[in-house]
């Protein structure tokens, strides 16, 4: 199965705000494809939306290491990490990750 198919499925769960399904499906996919950063991203996004910030932190911090030459995905990881640390009450790390995301967005323009 091409990886675009499950990524589109995860995007549709996100758009429909089905975050419980999103996080479970993404977690299942990343166990089968452990080097695919998109699955970590979507799992983290789902966990953030469900306010499961510790799970989001773990999956996002692992997944960011698999992002290679994809500044958009990297910026999205940093945004989700910022949301995670905001939820965990760590404002210094929240600001750090939002700043990194902002820097990547500026470089892309």
Model-derived features with residue positions:
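Start-of-helix register in tetratricopeptide repeats
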Residues: 4, 37-38, 72, 76
